[in-house]
C-alpha cells in the first residue's frame, strides 16, 4: 500500500462549503434532506455537467458494538440506530460525494459502496467474509472510544489485512467521540498508534444528526458537514492510491510498524 498522502494535498478540504461546492452538493440533496441512492442509481446535476465518477468498494471492519452501522448511517444521511442490534448478513450502502482535486481543479464524483456485516455472521459463514473482501478498495477499521478492547484489537486486524490484501487503503476511525470525557483510549495512545502505523486516524460522534425546523427530518446539509472530513479523507486516500497504481505518482517505501 502506498504511504498515505498529507491531508488536504489531494482534494480541496473545504470546497464543499464554497458556492461552487454547494451547487454540486445539491444533486445529493432534496429540500435540504439527503437523497438515498440504490446500487444502480446515481445523482443528476442540473444543469447537466460532464463529471467523472470514481467508484470504490469499502469494507467496514470492527468488533461488535463499536458503531459500524451507525457510522455508515451517518455517512449516508440516515437515522443513527439508538439501540445496538447486530447486523444480520451483509448490508450495502451507496454514498456519493463530489470533491475537487488540488492538482487539476477538476471535480470528481466519488461513489462509495460501504459493506457492513455483523461479527456473528462473519464468524459463522466463511463465504460472507470472502464476499466482503473480494475486490475491496479500502478497509475502514473502527474502534470505540468507550471500548478499550476494540482499540487494542486494531494491530491484529491491520496486520492480518496487510497480509491478505496488501494493496488496499486502510483508515482507522474512532467512534463515540461524543463520549470522549469517558474515554478508555487516551490521546497519548492515539499518538503512539499513529506514529507506529502511519495511517489516517479520524474521529466521529455517534449521536443523532441535527434536525430541520419540523424537528423530525434530518438536516442533510448539516449532516454532510459533520462527516465531510471522513468522505474527503476516503476520496483523498483512494484517488492517491489509484494514481500510484497507475504509475502517475512515485510510491515511497512503506514503514513497518514498530
Swiss-Prot record:
Keywords: Cell projection, Cilium, Cilium biogenesis/degradation, Cytoplasm, Cytoskeleton, Exocytosis, GTP-binding, Nucleotide-binding, Protein transport, Transport. GO terms for biological process: axoneme assembly; cilium assembly; cranial skeletal system development; endocardial cushion fusion; exocytosis; limb development; protein localization; protein processing. GTP binds at residues 64-65, 67-70, 82, 84, 87, 176, 178, 206. It is found in: Cytoplasm, Cytoskeleton, Cilium basal body; Cytoplasm, Cytoskeleton, Microtubule organizing center, Centrosome, Centriole. The keyword Cytoplasm applies. Interacts with FUZ. Associates with the CPLANE (ciliogenesis and planar polarity effectors) complex via its interaction with FUZ. This is Ciliogenesis and planar polarity effector 2. It comes from Homo sapiens (Human).
